[in-house]
Regions:
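Leucine-rich repeat domain C-terminal region
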Residues: 393-403
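Right-handed parallel beta-helix
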Residues: 134-147, 167-181, 193-213, 224-243, ...
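Residues that act as N-cap/strand-start positions at coil-to-secondary-structure junctions
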Residues: 49, 84, 120-122, 155, ...
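Structural detector of coil-to-beta-strand junctions
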Residues: 125, 158-160, 182-183, 243-244, ...
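Glycan-recognition and catalytic cores of secretory/periplasmic carbohydrate-active enzymes
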Residues: 386
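Extracellular polysaccharide-degrading/modifying enzymes targeting complex plant/algal/animal polysaccharides
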Residues: 1-165, 170, 175-177, 185, ...
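Residue-level marker of regulatory loop/turn positions in helix-turn-helix DNA-binding domains and
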Residues: 130, 153, 163, 224-225, ...
């Protein structure tokens, strides 16, 4: 069965050349017209002009432009991952006198009356209008083509499908595709006093209003007993403009498993700080396992409060830009990586994954354990990316940490960097694509990203060991001790052990037992055959035979700020 947010348009009239026009009564849209509603919200790049509506040709969304002339004379949009299709353009305007929406579309020689042409007309497809409608199962549906709005953490976060601030949903065996913004939302409820407040009120930055909305949610019933504990499994999620799955607060204690998440934000017609295959804030005790992420503008983005989060047994590849021409400085470049963990205090466990994109992990964070992974990309943004971008004044970002396995807030703190563990990983340096080198030149070394393209733990060189860190606090440290208060703001320790490095991947300087193989050339990649993906590599022929240490909760210890162990959600 199909649940669609779109309707067929079949009254096309030829205008000129490849351009056709059609009129639709605004009565079709009810009280929500996607063609008078612009995509907007906190952390959306304002220079992008896009309506929440879309036009689809045979199920594929076309490219909105801002004038009729751009429909008549379309140009290739080089930021898109699918440039050839970008000349299929559309423009819309309102006929106020007739109360109609007028479409102008370039079909590149096709007769739209002989093809399937649809426009999305509904904001959601399967989504309660009220909060608190829990314990619903959606199984085996095709859900597609809704006119969803941008879903930042400081707004009412909607998707085509979602539980709308409730508990215990199961979304399984569904195909979720072609949402204007987000496919599935496990997101925040509407707080009328704090809904895109940064955009609307302007006087408080979004980082502050986000802290405010978290505290407000706690006062208004955000608890383990009321919210979250959803399951998303075995879904095919693709071709959405912002995210495949989005969430803030509402996704706590959930399981996201065995999904295929791909081709997200490939059109590059939306840009901002909320884009990825999955983008979740406050993924407290969320388990993300056995998913396949590929061809996304970033695979998985865990932002703030990835506390008790586990990312395990996933396959990631092709989640960085294909070519340098796809980079867009106006859109924060959107270079992408497999996993981005941002200003969280942990504990976040990343284990038994295969990460094959050019950039494996962006780690502007602390409290992360990276264990038993096969990694063929680089670590970026280590030791940076945690301030708020002020030009001249200090702008540290304070983020919450919580009572272990609960939503109640225990405190707020900046990110000091470090407090990370790297055990028993295989690092392989892939050949660096010319396009990635050009992107690095284009974006440079900046506050948010260092552009590193070398695999391995070398970005953590110079971080203290636990023994070095503890030694700084020897003796009395209280008032009048003579010790500098800087002690409490210096980098935290990093633990390393059992890692193997091939093809020029580099270990951190302080790693004592690193195995660095400079003799053998390792090949690695993935290949699709008959709908199945295979890992092709010769690394198994050259792995050292020495035994690695068994890694356990006791080995990993606790994340510094929340003082919480790396343990299962049940403690």
């Amino acid at each position: 069965a199909v649940i669609t947010g779109a309707e067929i348009v079949d009254n096309w009239e030829h205008l000129e050349g490849d351009v056709w026009t059609a009129r639709v009564s605004n009565g079709l849209f009810g009280d929500y017209n996607p063609y008078t509603t612009l995509v907007s919200g906190d952390w959306f790049i304002a220079s992008y002009t896009a309506h929440t509506g879309e036009v689809y040709l045979n199920g594929k969304s076309m490219y909105e432009v801002t004038s009729l002339d751009q429909v008549k004379k379309p140009e290739i949009y080089k930021k898109s991952w699918d440039q050839a299709f970008t000349v299929y353009t559309w423009y819309v305007e309102q006929d106020e006198e007739k109360n109609e929406t007028v479409f102008y579309v370039n079909f590149q020689g096709k007769n739209p009356n002989e093809e399937t042409v649809e426009i999305n007309v509904r904001e959601n497809c399967f989504y309660p209008s009220k909060e608190g409608i829990g314990y619903i199962t959606l199984s085996g549906f095709v859900v597609k083509q809704a006119a969803t709005q941008w879903a930042p953490p400081t707004a009412y976060q909607e998707g085509m499908v979602g539980p709308h601030w409730s508990k215990g949903w199961i979304i399984e065996d569904c195909e979720i595709s072609d949402s204007k913004c987000s496919g599935i939302s496990l997101g925040k409820y509407r707080q009328p006093n704090n809904d895109n407040k940064w955009l609307k009120w302007k006087f408080k930055d979004g980082t502050q209003t986000e802290r405010d909305c978290i505290c407000q949610a706690q006062r208004e019933g955000w608890t383990k007993e009321n919210i979250g504990s959803h399951i998303i499994r075995r879904c095919n999620i693709h071709d959405c403009g912002q995210t495949g799955i989005v969430g803030h607060l509402g996704g706590v204690f959930s399981i996201i498993e065995d999904n295929h998440i791909h081709h997200i934000n490939n059109k590059q017609n939306l840009a901002g700080a909320e884009i990825g295959g999955i983008k979740m804030h406050a993924a407290i005790d969320v388990i993300i396992r056995r998913n396949h992420f590929h061809h996304c503008t970033r695979g998985l983005w865990l932002d703030w409060q990835a506390q008790g989060t586990r990312v395990t047994q996933n396959l990631f590849h092709d989640n960085t830009l294909p070519n340098e021409e796809n980079a867009n400085p106006e859109g924060m470049d959107g270079i992408g990586e497999d996993i981005f963990i941002e200003i969280s205090h942990g504990p976040t466990l990343v284990d038994n994954n295969v990460l094959l994109s050019d950039r494996a992990m962006k780690l502007a964070t602390q409290g992360v354990a990276v264990v038993h992974n096969l990694i063929a990309g680089s670590f970026t943004a280590v030791g940076r990316g945690v301030n708020n971008g002020s030009d001249k004044l200090p702008s540290p970002r304070y983020t919450p940490y919580h009572v272990p396995h609960r939503t109640e807030i225990n405190g707020f703190m900046t990110v000091l960097h470090g407090d990370c563990r790297f055990y028993n990983n295989i690092f392989i340096q892939k050949p660096v694509r010319a396009g990635m080198e050009e992107i690095r030149k284009l974006t440079g070394d900046n506050e948010w990203d260092d552009g590193n393209l070398t695999a391995g733990t070398a970005p953590y060189s110079g971080y203290p060991t636990l023994e070095e860190y503890v030694a700084r606090f020897e003796g009395y440290c209280g008032m009048g001790s003579g010790k500098s208060p800087d002690l409490y703001y210096e980098k935290l320790p990093v633990w390393l052990g059992g890692n193997v490095y091939f093809n020029g991947a580099k270990p951190a300087e302080q790693e004592q037992d690193a195995v660095v193989d400079t003799e053998h050339e390792i090949t690695i990649g993935v290949k699709e055959e008959n709908g199945k993906w295979k890992l092709e590599t010769n690394v198994y022929d050259y792995l050292p035979q020495n035994a690695c240490a068994v890694i356990s909760t006791e080995t990993l210890g606790m994340a510094f700020e929340p003082e919480q162990k790396y343990e299962n959600p049940d403690g």
